[in-house]
Amino acid sequence: MTSASVATGPVLTHRSALLDRLIDFEIEPGAEFVVELLPAGYSLSAEWGSLPKSAQDSDNGIVLISVVVAPSELPPRPRLAMLPPFPIEEASDSNSFDDLRASILVDRTIGIILLRLGHWAVAIAENGELVVTKTGSRYVKNQHRKGGQSSNRFRRGREKWIRELFDQAGEVASSRFREYPGQIDNLVLGGDRVVLGRFLKRVKLPDGIGDRTLPNRLSVDQPGRKALDTAARDAWSYRIYELSNDN
């Protein structure tokens, strides 16, 4: 009887660091691995039951790495579970890291929109490198302490400021995305979930890019150039869970 595995994480790991780790696995003396790439809609076996709900049903699919243990009659032991930043298109099951490495290295171009009330940032990134950036702001007052008609006027004014912020960010994003000479594969969003939801309802982005929004929303304190640099890195990062035996 094998002992249960306990999952820890996730740790956000950039694809370059992940590629280095795959090399370490390959040169590990006497180790043999099973590498599974599972598209969305997968079902995990009991050995992976300690993974959190977010890993049990990822819209991008999941990568599972297990270690083959002796004697060979025993099932492979879970080692790593990875939530990829982009959707897994085709299932794979092998003793090689070749399919995983090929998936990691696929060329991609993404649009990025970071939005919080008062600030926005727009970018296009090719394989993790920013090639187009634009940032801006629009004043949106947060609080009003008086009641009555004054409060109603403030609320109407605030809604107007928010619409103007959305329109400003949407116009710039649409312009930059439309002018880009290549294909934008996906859209990545960062910022406040509610604000982003309202933004997408108001603004129609070109070429149906809004329909290709990736499920992982990026964490952003204040949209700007520094936040775009971080977003481009995080957009090509994997969420990795380590699994160890609970003895």
Task: State the predicted function of each range.
Residues M1-N247:
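Terminal alpha-helical anchor/extension segments at protein ends
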